[in-house]
C-alpha cells in the first residue's frame, strides 16, 4: 500500500512534463529512403555475386547447404 502514493505521484509528474523531441532534426539529416535504397543495392549486388560463383546452391555456397 505504501507504493500506491509514489506511483500516483510519478504518473502525475510524467503527465505534466512538456513533450519535446529528444534530438532536434538537423538540416543536413539524410532521409531514410536513401539508406533503404543503399541497402537494397548492396543486397542485390551480394545476391548476384553469390549466384554467379555458385551455379548449384548446394555445391559451394555455405548458406545454400541443406541438411
UniProtKB/Swiss-Prot annotation:
The modification Tryptophan amide is found at residue 63. It comes from the Eukaryota. It comes from Conus pulicarius. GO terms for cellular component: extracellular region. One of its GO terms (molecular function) is toxin activity. InterPro entries: T-conotoxin (IPR031565). This is Conotoxin Pu5.1. Belongs to the conotoxin T superfamily. Keywords: Amidation, Disulfide bond, Secreted, Signal, Toxin. It is found in: Secreted.
Amino acid at each position: 500500500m505504501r507504493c500506491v502514493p509514489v506511483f500516483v505521484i510519478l504518473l502525475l509528474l510524467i503527465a505534466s512534463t512538456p513533450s519535446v523531441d529528444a534530438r532536434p532534426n538537423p538540416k543536413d539529416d539524410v532521409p531514410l529512403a536513401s539508406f533503404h535504397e543503399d541497402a537494397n543495392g548492396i543486397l542485390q549486388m551480394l545476391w548476384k555475386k553469390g549466384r554467379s560463383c555458385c551455379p548449384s546452391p548446394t555445391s559451394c555456397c555455405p548458406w545454400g547447404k541443406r541438411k
